[in-house]
């Protein structure tokens, strides 16, 4: 019958004079099984039909059947006209085991549709709808392409300003004022407020101007550490939007150049054989290397070494017209939770009426006394009295808004009411609802609760689908609870087979929820029968009703308001708590420091000047309050979490002897662990037989999260949670809520590539929600750790996440779903992001090869869109896979998505212990350390006993929950690479790393991190200080492997260059997750601007100068097009990696060779105001390189051991690391400090003896070095701390230094 369905459709199209059908069939792998996916399109129809099966023929048959069903729904065809689908129609049996018993009545086998491949969509025009000021067709795409090319050959490290016409924080505010004066418009009224934080002061400025050219208002936002910076950022935001709307031209004024510090040269010598290999390889690929006239090049007139030749490019796709997400109601022969046809008898060939009848038979079979009791309990919920109203309103309206107070039962009952209405009408097969929740724990717990209420197990009527875990229900008459992110992934295949979409907790305004709302708004305008239900306890009803009611033919959005069944909750604010407990907090540290001395020099966690009276509302208390309470209040800084007050409340609860669990709301993981550790060490709460201390965080595993629902007889449960417990879940024994009134927000400032994790005040909505957690099952108590005055000053609602994060990932999703222009689509949001953010996201994605010149996805872009990590990290993960280092890259990529696993051994510890530092070995790298931790943890897990992984974590003071999450993310990344990106399984094998000896995979990993993280590069200047490549000062984060054990130490890195994951603004700027890199790694993988500035001198990004062979540098730069060509080839044809050709194999080896630690070189000292003499030259005895109390011997593969370096007599020892020996051809004579620098240097030559050098180091003339250094055949040297004259011999495996040559 396969021929009949396709031929019937073909004949019908010809008879009705439509275009011919186009079948597009592709192979895909799901969980190691091959299936074929067919998409059917017909000119003149906006619908894309879909079919899949285990062979191409059946996939096309299913697609034809799907299109026929679409024509029936559109009234263009009669159901009776379509040939009946029978077993003879399909050749294959399903690989999914969709049997009558297993699938239809018990649900499908467990699986994750997050990892299913998915599908297309329709669309409209952009919201700034004044055609006179819109770009002409194609101009936008040309502009983005031009800017992407400029990024690739940028003349400045400030890449983002080039995208936006050169408008920066320095020039925008003045230009905006001049524009408004010229247009005779009022000047900008900047509204600035403080975003309170416990770690940093952040000013947030908002402004709005009317722009007559487009007849609308433009809104700008900006943040900064002070009002001036914040207003400048806000003005820049407005000006950049005006530039992209063709209202303002690009900036043409003088460019203010920042003062560039003179950094010491870094000398590198590449051996002749390696240089020759690189040159020959580059030329064999078809690249001609430039001839460089070194003698004519100067710093003022440099010669560029970059090439714009491309050896391979991604094919350019045609501009794809915007389409809508495909939708169809529940259909015969379709499993919506698998996004797959059902090929196996008998379910594949049962009619919808037959399926409905079988569902009712199963429902009748369940009836009994136990179920009747549960039904009676459901009837007592407040939502029960609204049942008929809900069912009727949803049936009659495309969108329904339900505002139900906490405890009314909406999250568990609404979907059941709708299902039961279909069952009562003997139409159960026509109902399938997907219910989205903001968090995993909500989706899982609700599925379990609803299944229990229906007398079933999860996987029958009810299922769930969350990251790393799923239990799919039956394909008809079912409810699927999922996270919003999973719902987005489902949309790639369209929402076929789903009758109702229910979005719960829509008030949270996370970026995925706002995205889904835009999609649903477009869908209901196209699909009349789709039903959408929006639910929340606290919601701005006007905002959402206006959003949906503006759709033509939809009509006004009905709102159902329900009261909750909550028990009375007595709430207390901070002044009430201190008064009732008679608690006097300790004197704050700031006052103690005034009495006892200055603050610690390395404190980068606090916030100076937070306690000024204009901001701290704990000081601005009612005049009627007595002096003792005023003093107590003033001692609590609003910037801090008052852990002492929390303990006092818990003590009071314990002393009263009234049972009930305690729920404590804290902003983030660090605060959760701090309190948990304090409680575990507490004399009272540390008693395991009386208390169960449970952390609750969104990134804990599902098993860890479920513990909060358990009952512990004889114990009081204390749950320490983020806002994950704020909505959608009921912990039925919570009586007490302690609320910090804080929340964690991740903010990103694109112009300076700065990440800011702000701990801000929660909104009133959040605080009210948290309070309600105490009154779900009995009368409760809520303790809010803010003053009443502060509560009244809180914002009513939180800031939409879409307005404060990068849009790169969401732009990829828009393109993957074929929703058209990123700007046009996001312009339809509840609160659209500024247009300059949209343009920036497109330009960055195009520069990395994810979008082509038509702004359509390339094959790389499609892979990146399916990756659950940042696009820049995903790109190097794919490249690393192509280079044979996929396993190690999965380790580091997964770790970068989660908090650090290192836990301080003691609460007063501010740095990593020696035991924890073992994981870095001799690599000076936080990234290497985390890979080493993950591999050690994986080995412990593979032992098969939970005790092994627990012992591993306890021994090294690691967080077991974080490592479980990281391991789960790693497995998912490997699964996506194999099943959705189609990389061969055998190239993703596990790789063991050696952190104490040479390891080519770790070296390559660091090179790829440079590519991913650039321009996050810094130059080490001493102690914890670094200079970023933008020449701004920063500190190495205290919890880095690269920080000395104490403040007296200097770290002696083998190279002054470092790469870091992110800059975080707290009290100062700190760099997190750092690794030492070589200048070669920066040259090849990271620099944007490479120039010859003299004979033997190469300058990177106008900042770092390398002394090396210029022709070799040009050849190394020539490897870039070769790397890009391999990436293109790998994305276009991943299967080709199963067998490498000789050229690709040689590229793999070359990249590993040039990434070697052999090329790490020390530079001379920095004479800069950022570094004092004390930081350069230590007075008196210097400590060892690292004081590892429990380090133990180094690996035998390394020629370095800590005990090789005795305390110095003065000056600094800068030994080489790894296998750097005197007779190595890479070790050449090279000075490391300019004259008069105050420091000596090291010399090497091929024979193992240092040559005499006649040069000036302070007052020193020369130094001789001897052989026998570390028993390694020479290669040692002596460093003069002050100058003078000296020399000596390295003796018997030890080197030493002379302080007075």
From Swiss-Prot:
Location of the region described as RGG in the Swiss-Prot/TrEMBL record: 1172-1301
Annotated transmembrane regions: none
Catalytic activity: ATP + H2O = ADP + phosphate + H(+)
Compositional bias ranges of the Acidic residues kind: 601-611
Keywords: Activator, ATP-binding, Cell cycle, Cell division, Cytoplasm, Cytoskeleton, Developmental protein, DNA replication, DNA-binding, Helicase, Hydrolase, Manganese, Metal-binding, Mitosis, mRNA processing, mRNA splicing, mRNA transport, Nucleotide-binding, Nucleus, Repeat, RNA-binding, RNA-mediated gene silencing, Transcription, Transcription regulation, Transcription termination, Translation regulation, Transport
Gene Ontology biological process terms, A to Z: cell division; chromatin organization; DNA replication; DNA-templated transcription termination; germ cell development; mRNA processing; mRNA transport; negative regulation of gene expression, epigenetic
Enzyme class: hydrolase
Region (HA2): 840-931
A GO molecular function held by the record: 3'-5' DNA helicase activity
UniProt cross-references to PROSITE patterns, sorted A to Z: DEAH_ATP_HELICASE, DS_RBD, HELICASE_ATP_BIND_1, HELICASE_CTER
Location of the motif DEAH box: 504-507
Region of interest called OB-fold, as start-end residue ranges on this chain: 971-1089
Subcellular location: Nucleus; Nucleus, Nucleoplasm; Nucleus, Nucleolus; Cytoplasm
Region feature (siRNA-binding): 6-10, 55-57, 226-228
Helicase ATP-binding domain mapped to chain residues: 391-563
Keyword Manganese part of the UniProt annotation: yes
Domain DRBM as annotated: residue spans: 4-73, 171-244
Positions of the UniProt region annotated as Core helicase: 391-818
Subunit composition and interactions: Component of the coding region determinant (CRD)-mediated complex. Identified in mRNP granule complexes containing untranslated mRNAs. Associates with the RISC complex. Associates with the SMN complex. Associates with polysomes.
Family to which this protein belongs: Belongs to the DEAD box helicase family. DEAH subfamily.
Protein name in the entry: ATP-dependent RNA helicase A
Source organism of this protein record: Caenorhabditis elegans
